[in-house]
Every structure is written in structure tokens, then in C-alpha cells.
């Protein structure tokens, strides 16, 4: 019937929306998420990424966040929830893309359906779908669409989505390259047109992005953050293969615990395709692209979201494995329905705290939620006044929640950003500290729930000493709810005086506490 081919994709979309929606939108706002939200807030005000906040990843995630902030302004909704809703929509669409990819590669609707249901069970992806903005959530959608259109030989669209994935995370440029390579190696009669369409699709998003930053007078900032910093200053943890493999294992085992067996079977199914004879083109985009994330992961694997790039392969591989097994039975439809129900049950069980509490803590490092963070941010204003000047050197969540502007683009200084500051700010790192002193922040946020790195992590010895020397006489560390801040000692003293005045009016004997504070 007309439109019948859309029924199952729409049902999968609705199912994904239901399952992911069960996680709720109140998950903790992690440091990295707040960087993209802050950039999105500033972009909605007309300030482009890299100018508003320095970052070394692609511009697409803050642009998507900026779109969400603009929508919140249009509808009068909360900007954090609206941005999360936009990223949630990309996650739901990713499930549909996985279905279409599995169906196209293995020419089986059952394989596509089981692949989508398998994908719903990947906890590390599902949890972040509503608690972001996790920048790699839309990456999976773009990756799956790039592979889907390459499988269908729709070169422009494959190149377009591969290019968008590259603008989200630089290593994804491998997918755009695979599209171009496949197009350029088509038979002679197809080659010219295919190559031209692939090149046009790849070029279009890049040219639009470059034009945007050029128009904003920020092309140098874009090129520096997107490309140069990663070669000149970026600092990571262990880079030895053994260390990387240990990190990868620890960040896969628990966050994906309920689906480890399907992941393993799915990956092995994909690997088996390399030896399948006779070989068919429909497998080629998947097989040519698959080594790229493997090679990158051997070089740099940090957290569970670094495994996202493998999820489409694992999902369609496991879906194909189950579909092939079902075809060998007497009643494949009934067994497919049973297996689908089992996979859906796992996906639903993942939403229960009793099942996923360990995985959740591994992903976020805290049990704090967004409402708790909001309360703490408001408490900061209540304690020190709404006119309090705020800055961040490692924890911009407070700036996002209170809609405050940082005095400079450096919301975090780990991972080699201190060397970037030293190279680009007039007067170097010490000049940056002098500029910060001129701004005279009453409080500087530096740590929050779920973080693992202090602002001193990865700093050079000289920069660590300079920061410590500058902070010690002026500020004292103070915990307010889930946040740690360096608060000016003068502000704390003034607060103590106010509290003592109130206490003395109720109990004259309480004046001694002020002397204790002044002596600190």
C-alpha cells in the first residue's frame, strides 16, 4: 500500500523515543556537556564556536546545541532541556538509520529490525541520549547514514553525511574518504559521475562551515582549534598500546555489560564478511571503513563514548547473525518475534537503576542530577550576590546554569590548553593570569561532580606553579553542593561578618566565630 514502507521505520522511531525517554532528561550535566552547551548559548547570541570557548573538536556539536538554544528562545522553554531534546531526537533517528543500514547491507528486513533492537540495548549510548549534549550522539546517526548511502551508491548523500561526521569529530573524516575512494574505484562508465557527486557531497558542509567562520571573522580561530591545536599542544593520557587497550576494556566492559555477547558476535560477523565468497559490493562500505576506527582506537581511546563508532557495526552484525540463524528454523517469524522481544526487554531493563547503577556510575562518576546542580548554582548567587563575577578554569556548568559569560574562551585548561594559552595570549600564561586578575572574579569554578581531572592535570610545571602562586593569596577552595570553587577570601570574610551579625543579634556569645574566620 502507498506509504507502507514507512510504517516499520516510524514504529522503530516511536519505540526508540519511548525507550530513550525512560531515562529522563535530568541526568547530571557533565563538564564536557557544559562546554558544548555554553558554546551553544553564545552561538545563539551571535558568537561562533572557538571564539566563545576554545575547543579542539569539531564545530558541529556546538552548532547543534546553538540550534537548540535558539529553539528554546523561540518557544520560551528551558535551554538545557531543549538542547537535550534536540540531541535525543538525533539518537532516536540513529536507531532508524541502523535499521535501514542493516536491511540494506544484508538485504533482510529481519536483520535490520533485530539490528535496531540490538542497538537500543547499548546502555552507554542510551543513557547519554537524554543527558547530554553528548557530541558523539549525532555522530552515530551521521556514520550510519554515510554507510547506508554508500551501500546504495548514492554518492552525494554518503559524502555529505561523512563530511558532517568529520565536522563533528575529526577521525570520522575516514568515512568521507571511504565514500570518495569507493566512488573513484567504480567501473569506468560510472567513475566520473560517482566521483563528482561524492566530492560535491564532501565539500558542501566544509565550504559552508568555512564561509560561516570567515563571515564571523573567526576563520583563524576555527582552523586553530579544529586542526592546529591537535598537532601542536594536545595532551592525552597513556598512548602505549597496552595502556590504551586496558583503558578501552575498562570503558567497554561495564557500560556495555548487558550487551557484551551481542557486541562480540556482531563484530565477529562483520569480520567474517572479509572471507565471504562470492564477494558482493553491498558489504564493501562496511568492510573498507571498519579498519579506520580500529586503528584510531589503538592510538587514542579515552571513554565509553569512544566506542560509539563501533556500535553500528556490532548492531547490524548481530542482527544479521540472528536473522541468518532464524532462516534455518521451521518457524523463523515466530522466533524472530521472540528474539526481538528479548532484545527489547534488555533495552527496557537497562533503564532500571537495579540493573544499570554500576554502569551509570562508570559513565558519570556521580549520582548527582541536574536539579541538584541547579540548586547549587542558585545557592552560589544567594550566598555571594547576583552581581558576583564568575569564571571557569575547568568546570563551566555553573556558567551554563546561571547564563554567565566567562571573561575569556578558556573554560578549561587541561589537555594542553595551558600551552595554547601561553602561545596565543599576549604575555603568555602569566599574561592570561593578569587578564583574569583585571576581571577580578569573585569565584572561579574548577571542579564538579562527575569530573576526574583537576585544572592542574597536564599543566606544565611552570604553569602549575604560576597558577598556584596566583590563587593562594587571593582565593580559598569552597565546596557548594556538587561544585568546587575558588572563592575570594574577601568575599568569604564578608559573608562571615554578615553571618556573625545575624547570629549576634540572636546570641551575643557568637561573636568569637568571626575572629576564627579572620585568623584563617
Residue positions per predicted region:
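Transmembrane-helix signature of polytopic, membrane-embedded enzymes
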Residues: 4, 98-123, 140-141, 156-157, ...
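Short periplasmic/luminal acceptor-recognition loop of GT-C membrane glycosyltransferases, typified by
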Residues: 56, 158, 177, 354-357, ...
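Loop-to-helix entry region of an early transmembrane alpha helix in multi-pass inner-membrane enzymes
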Residues: 59, 63, 74-96
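Multi-pass, polyprenyl lipid-linked donor-dependent membrane glycosyltransferases
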Residues: 60, 86-90, 114-121, 125-145, ...
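Membrane-interface alpha helices of multi-pass inner-membrane proteins
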Residues: 143-149, 155-170, 175-183, 203-204, ...
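Hydrophobic/aromatic-rich transmembrane helices and adjacent perimembrane loops
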Residues: 293, 299-334, 338
Amino acid at each position: 500500500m502507498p506509504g507502507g514502507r514507512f510504517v516499520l521505520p516510524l514504529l522503530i522511531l516511536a519505540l526508540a523515543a519511548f525507550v530513550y525517554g525512560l531515562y529522563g532528561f535530568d541526568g547530571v550535566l557533565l563538564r564536557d556537556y557544559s562546554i558544548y552547551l555554553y558554546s551553544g548559548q553564545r552561538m545563539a547570541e551571535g558568537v561562533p564556536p572557538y571564539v566563545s570557548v576554545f575547543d579542539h573538536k569539531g564545530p558541529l556539536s556546538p552548532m547543534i546545541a546553538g540550534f537548540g538554544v535558539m529553539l528554546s528562545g523561540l518557544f520560551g522553554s528551558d535551554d538545557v532541556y531543549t538542547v537535550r531534546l534536540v540531541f535525543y531526537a538525533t539518537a532516536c533517528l540513529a536507531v532508524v538509520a541502523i535499521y535501514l543500514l542493516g536491511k540494506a547491507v544484508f538485504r533482510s528486513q529481519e536483520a535490520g529490525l533485530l539490528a535496531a533492537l540490538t542497538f537500543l540495548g547499548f546502555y552507554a549510548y542510551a543513557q547519554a541520549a537524554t543527558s547530554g549534549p553528548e557530541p558523539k550522539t549525532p555522530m552515530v546517526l551521521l556514520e550510519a547514514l554515510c554507510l547506508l548511502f554508500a551501500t546504495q551508491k548514492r554518492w552525494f548523500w554518503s559524502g555529505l553525511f561523512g563530511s558532517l561526521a568529520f565536522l563533528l569529530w575529526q577521525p570520522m573524516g575516514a568515512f568521507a574518504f571511504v565514500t570518495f575512494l569507493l566512488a573513484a574505484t567504480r567501473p569506468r562508465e560510472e567513475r566520473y559521475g560517482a566521483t563528482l557527486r561524492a566530492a560535491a557531497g564532501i565539500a558542501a558542509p566544509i565550504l559552508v562551515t568555512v564561509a560561516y567562520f570567515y563571515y564571523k571573522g573567526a576563520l583563524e580561530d576555527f582552523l586553530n582549534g579544529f586542526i592546529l591545536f591537535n598537532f601542536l599542544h594536545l595532551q592525552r593520557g597513556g598512548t602505549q598500546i597496552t595502556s590504551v587497550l586496558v583503558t578501552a576494556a575498562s570503558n567497554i566492559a561495564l557500560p556495555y555489560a548487558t550487551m557484551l555477547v551481542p557486541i562480540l558476535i556482531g563484530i565477529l560477523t562483520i569480520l567474517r564478511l572479509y572471507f565471504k565468497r562470492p564477494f558482493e559490493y553491498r558489504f564493501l562500505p562496511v568492510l573498507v571503513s571498519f579498519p579506520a576506527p580500529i586503528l584510531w582506537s589503538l592510538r587514542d581511546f579515552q571513554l565509553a563514548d569512544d566506542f560509539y563508532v563501533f556500535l553500528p557495526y556490532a548492531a547490524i552484525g548481530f542482527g544479521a547473525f540472528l536473522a541468518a540463524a532464524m532462516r534455518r528454523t521451521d518457524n523463523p517469524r515466530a522466533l524472530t518475534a521472540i528474539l526481538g522481544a528479548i532484545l527489547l526487554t534488555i533495552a527496557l531493563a537497562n533503564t532500571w537503576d537495579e540493573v544499570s547503577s554500576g554502569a551509570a556510575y562508570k559513565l558519570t562518576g556521580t549520582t548527582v542530577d541536574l536539579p541538584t546542580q541547579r540548586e547549587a548554582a542558585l545557592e552560589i548567587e544567594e550566598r555571594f550576590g547576583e552581581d558576583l563575577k564568575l569564571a571557569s578554569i575547568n568546570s563551566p556548568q555553573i556558567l551554563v546554569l546561571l547564563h554567565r559569560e566567562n571573561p575569556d574562551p578558556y573554560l578549561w585548561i587541561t589537555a594542553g590548553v595551558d600551552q595554547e594559552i601561553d602561545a596565543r595570549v599576549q604575555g603568555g600564561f602569566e599574561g592570561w593570569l593578569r587578564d583574569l586578575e583585571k576581571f577580578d572574579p569573585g569565584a572561579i569554578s574548577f571542579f564538579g561532580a562527575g569530573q576526574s581531572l583537576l585544572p592542574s592535570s597536564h599543566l606544565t610545571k611552570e604553569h602549575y606553579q604560576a597558577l598556584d602562586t596566583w590563587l593562594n593569596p587571593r582565593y580559598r577552595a569552597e565546596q557548594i553542593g556538587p561544585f568546587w570553587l575558588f572563592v575570594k577570601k574577601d568575599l568569604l570574610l564578608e559573608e562571615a561578618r554578615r553571618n556573625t551579625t545575624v547570629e549576634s543579634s540572636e546570641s551575643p556569645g557568637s561573636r568569637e566565630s568571626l575572629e576564627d574566620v579572620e585568623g584563617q
